[in-house]
Amino acid sequence: MKYIKKLIYVLLLTVATQVATAQIKILYGPYLQNVKENEATIVWVADKPSIGWVELAPNDGTHYYGEERPKYFDTTNGVKNTSLLHAVKVKAFTPGTTYRYRIYSQEVLSHEGINVIYGRVAASDVYKKNALTFTTCDPNKKETSFVMINDIHGRENIITKLLNNANYKDKDLIIFNGDMVSEFKDEQTIFNGFMKESIDLFASEKPMYYARGNHETRGEFATSFQKYFSPKEPFLYYLFRQGPVCFIMLDTGEDKPDSDIEYSGITDYDGYRTDQVEWMKELYKNEDFKQAKFKVVIAHMPPSADLNIWHGQKDVLKKFVPILNELGVDLMLCGHLHRNKYEEPSAGIKFPVLVNSNNSVVSVETNGDQMNLEVLDLDGKVVTKKSYTAK
């Protein structure tokens, strides 16, 4: 009798364990972050606490199942992270090379002392589909192209139309220049607002780079922004190079003074912008920056000498512009104003500033010593067209 009871208990426990682990799945992703010439970060979200890892394979025509692929785990200081959200940074790539990859999440049922009990595994499909791929950046690539959108404010229904108008499938990379949602309230806001659509379109295989806007700084989830975007970078401001273009990604912070009642005393963006100036002062030493034909700044809020501008734009003018003038940048691409605007170089701002509206897309392609830019509206009509010659 005792044996039967014990057997029933074991069977029930087995069934319960199987039920508990049967539903693990990848909720969102994967999507690429901070793809550079020799590294890339891959991010995804599972629906249960789990460990995560990425497998990599060369894009050499062999079947993905042809051999065991090397694994790269989501870890912190040598310990595999148990989390819903996973981010894995892989290094030692070859520039301009395409790689195949696969993501995994294995549920962690319990972790007591030194004992860890694992459940089932969810993974991206390489059986019924081709493995996902990405291509690393290449500073020696002769030409490059990119598109930029901004100020979507959760209107995911216009993303596909804007990107299609710019022939995004033929471009090397995509840039999000801030205010993709109106408030960072929770994870669902991110994915329902713009990332699910982006993943479905391109973000699993085409690099996306994100400059934070002033609306991503708001909401109880705002401090989690970097867990999802640039999660393995030291800061949200950084530099990367693709072909003849060096991109300087800046974070312009909030638009009002830090003391404004809207921020409840939780912000210090004046100090944050000062930190970025100190970082920019070192860019002239960077080889990618020095050797690039074109130097393009991505920053959400544009600088302006208008007397009616708010504090954030004024601080960008005061702090960012002098060092950018010294660095000799070729173009600054901004958003924020919800209208199209173009400012030619002036005595104070020695580079052109293009502001993209919330209902248009910027499309850029290089051709030898020329960098050609178009701004297209929702109907695909060209509303601005510019060309820049390498200095």
Model-assigned labels for residue ranges:
Residues 147-150, 173-179, 206-214, 296-300, ...:
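Active-site neighborhood of phospho(di)ester-bond hydrolases with catalytic His/Asp-centered motifs
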